[in-house]
Amino acid sequence: MSEANVNKKEKGQKKVRTGYVVSDKMAKTIVVELEDRKQHALYGKIMRRNSRVKAHDEEGLAGVGDRVRIEETRPLSKDKHFRLLDIVEKAR
């Protein structure tokens, strides 16, 4: 085993999430609403929780209502930590 292989650390997978674009008014930035579903520990009811994140859209391809996939990345600004991977479904 070489020394390079011993010192190399495995990096974890980046988070990939799917959500809907709710705003595209900023330059090269979209706001994506993500839905998180969890089951209540005691009662078993499915609880829904929405969060909004800003994502980098270099070409400005995504529009409001589009379903998109975003990937976690290094901080690009104060609150932009995701980038657009692809558009899953265009809005009608």
From Swiss-Prot:
A Pfam family it matches: Ribosomal_S17
Keywords: Ribonucleoprotein, Ribosomal protein, RNA-binding, rRNA-binding
Annotated GO biological process: translation
GO-annotated cellular components: cytosolic small ribosomal subunit
Top-level taxon of the source organism: Bacteria
Gene Ontology molecular function, alphabetical: rRNA binding; structural constituent of ribosome
InterPro entries named among the record's database cross-references: NA-bd_OB-fold, Ribosomal_uS17, Ribosomal_uS17_bact/chlr, Ribosomal_uS17_CS
UniProt family annotation: Belongs to the universal ribosomal protein uS17 family.
Assembly mode: Part of the 30S ribosomal subunit.
Annotated function: One of the primary rRNA binding proteins, it binds specifically to the 5'-end of 16S ribosomal RNA.
This protein's name: Small ribosomal subunit protein uS17
Species per Swiss-Prot/TrEMBL record: Corynebacterium urealyticum (strain ATCC 43042 / DSM 7109)
